[in-house]
């Protein structure tokens, strides 16, 4: 175990001996195989996939909590249902696991529903949000919002080639505790970072950055763009990139080279 980032997932304790593990669609098989490999041999823990039986609805925005309260008897007040909490109850007539988490950077809830009750849950959500002008949003919108917030995307900004400290996740790692890959990670910490994940403010108002584009400093390639999107609320052309530690200082001037061979000057700030 090399000490690098292995997966990205949401884990929730359901308080009845079950742990909910929600990962990216693209990593389902990878994560299932890795988890199965590390199950205790005595069979005391079982691993079940809910991919084919459940679907997730995302309710996000400043009115999300009020809309959620309209369609459930669960107490959705901030005091009873705070950030990073999970509750089980009904959405309309549909049984649901509801998590107070967000990938958009706004107040948001994940509503996990069994597929045979999905339509009922969706109708309850639409009815509860109608008076507030609630509408659908797509992946490009959430990509823009999560980049403004500084949230990282699996297999884009979070990849198995780099460790948590290089990926900006060091504050979540407790090196004084034992875990799989700890020895390898400690060796990499001692050796120093190979690359560092940084955020870029691209000084161009007509062309976005491109994931995979090279990042240069003084004519030398120093890194690669991992994600890019226009931040509509902050009015900035945003990107994330892994760059050499020497080029990872706030205010460093770098250049992102797009696939169309345009050069996009950047003014960098750490995310």
Where is each model-derived feature located?
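Short beta-strand/strand-turn micro-motif
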Residues: 4-8, 95-99, 112, 177-250, ...
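Short cationic amphipathic helices and targeting signals
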Residues: 8-13, 17-25, 55-59, 103-114, ...
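Glycine-centered loop/turn motifs
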Residues: 28, 79-87, 208-214, 251
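Short, conserved charged micro-motifs
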Residues: 29-30, 65-67, 117-123, 208-210, ...
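Glycine-rich, acidic
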Residues: 38-39, 44-189, 193, 201
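Conserved small/polar residues in nucleotide/adenosyl-binding loops
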Residues: 260-266
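Hydrophobic alpha-helical segments, chiefly the membrane-spanning helices
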Residues: 270-271
């Amino acid at each position: 175990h090399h000490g690098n980032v292995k997966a990205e997932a949401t884990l929730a304790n359901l308080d009845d001996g079950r742990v909910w593990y929600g990962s990216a669609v693209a990593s389902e098989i990878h994560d299932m195989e890795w988890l199965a490999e590390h199950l205790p041999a005595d069979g005391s823990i079982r691993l079940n996939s809910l991919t084919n039986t459940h679907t997730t609805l995302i309710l996000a925005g400043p009115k999300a909590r009020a809309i959620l309260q309209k369609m459930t008897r669960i107490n959705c007040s901030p005091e009873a249902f705070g950030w990073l909490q999970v509750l089980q109850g009904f959405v309309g007539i549909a049984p649901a696991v509801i998590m107070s988490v967000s990938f958009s950077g706004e107040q948001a809830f994940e509503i996990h529903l069994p597929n045979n009750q999905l339509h009922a849950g969706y109708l309850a959500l639409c009815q509860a949000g109608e008076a507030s002008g609630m509408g659908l949003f797509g992946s490009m919108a959430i990509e823009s919002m999560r980049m403004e917030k500084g949230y990282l995307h699996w297999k884009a900004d979070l990849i198995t080639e780099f460790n948590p400290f290089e990926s900006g996740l060091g504050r979540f790692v407790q090196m004084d505790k034992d875990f799989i890959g700890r020895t390898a990670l400690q060796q990499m910490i001692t050796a120093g970072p190979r690359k560092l994940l940084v955020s870029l403010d691209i000084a161009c108002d007509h062309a976005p950055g491109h994931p995979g584009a090279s990042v240069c400093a003084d004519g030398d390639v120093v890194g690669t763009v991992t994600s890019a999107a226009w931040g509509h609320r902050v009015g900035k052309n945003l990107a994330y990139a892994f760059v050499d530690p020497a080029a990872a200082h706030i205010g460093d001037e770098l250049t992102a080279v797009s696939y169309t061979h345009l050069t996009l000057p950047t003014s960098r700030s750490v995310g």
